[in-house]
């Protein structure tokens, strides 16, 4: 076993403190929880298809350049809240680009750590009846912990099984279990984030993530009005 502590700063201001732990591969019991039965990604709508229908510069940019394909089981939160509040979310994700076979596990795991931040707080939004375009919302990651249990293939479909056990005082807690396409548990993640709305006491309005006027009856896949 070994550990390494990393500190990052920008223009003299500390922006990150990270502690990483390592272990050499060794023999031992191989047990994990079972992945839930959910619709396969081939039967779900890609976020790329949704972005390409939205007349918004950020959406158009993501529709062309997003490095990962995301497919929500319960429906996405890009344009409107979920019809029913829930603290649970399932989604599939994989890289859009082919990953060379010789790519090391260091790269695969780094990419998973990078991309999971895009969706980790979505169960918090879902439980509060919010979406990425909720007017005035302010959101930021505060703390993040991640464990890698098995090898990761970021070029294959990964299933995120997420929940949010608590929200209070402008902070929300989220957890995720990440399974590979064969059902193996490859990673466990926990993250706390700031999720604030202008109705919260003493909170200034944020920018939200989308400023789009939607037509009545729009299901999130049609062009906004």
Where are these regions (language model features)?
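Terminal targeting signals and extreme-terminal segments of soluble enzymes
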Residues: 1-225
